[in-house]
């Protein structure tokens, strides 16, 4: 939403700031990911930021997603995720990194794959044969950095999950000019968004 408002206001997406720590993770992730670099046609970068869980002690997270979109099939290939996380003092670096890697990949799964189908009030996905989570072959390159901080430690349960889908959605927009606003972002949804863009 911030990216869309920023574009409407004529500013860069990562210029839509807020708290100092949010502005810091946004600036750092943009620099780390090479925000603004030239990409081939059909590819795009999207940026997003979140904070959570407790308002008194939030974890600030920013993410840049790099995608390639096939305009014919609607297939989205997630090439890379870059995340910068400010969770205060990191007590156990290896554990923190593992937590953020897992959280980010869960975010990818929710953004591009997982979604329950219903028909006549009944769940259609009764086993993993029909319910498709993220698989090893779909795992993108991950680059995660923690902000060095003297603040007290904060949570790392889900912050890296929540930032991924909006970054991917913004990257799809950057690649195609089409907005997809519902999850999961499957090829059919991308094709509908592309068709809607052409009608506008």
Give residue spans per PLM region.
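C-terminal catalytic domains of large/alpha subunits in multi-subunit enzymes
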Residues: 1-54, 62-64, 68-200
């Amino acid at each position: 939403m911030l990216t869309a408002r920023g574009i409407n206001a004529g500013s860069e997406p990562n210029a839509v700031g807020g708290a100092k720590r949010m502005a810091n993770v946004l600036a750092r992730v943009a620099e780390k990911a090479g925000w603004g670099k030239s990409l081939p046609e059909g590819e795009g970068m999207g940026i997003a930021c979140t904070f959570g869980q407790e308002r008194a002690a939030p974890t600030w997270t920013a993410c840049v997603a790099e995608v390639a979109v096939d305009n014919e099939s609607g297939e989205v290939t997630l090439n890379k995720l870059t995340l910068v996380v400010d969770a205060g003092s990191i007590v156990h670096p290896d554990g923190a990194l593992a937590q953020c890697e897992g959280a980010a990949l869960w975010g990818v799964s929710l953004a591009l794959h997982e979604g329950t189908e219903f028909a006549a009030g009944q769940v259609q996905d009764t086993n993993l044969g029909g319910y498709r989570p993220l698989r090893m072959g779909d795992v993108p390159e991950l680059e995660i950095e923690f902000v060095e901080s003297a603040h007290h430690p904060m949570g790392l349960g889900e912050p890296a999950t929540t930032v991924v889908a909006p970054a991917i959605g913004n990257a799809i927009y950057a690649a195609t000019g089409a907005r997809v606003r519902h999850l999961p972002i499957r090829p059919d949804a991308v094709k509908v968004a592309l068709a809607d863009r052409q009608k506008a």
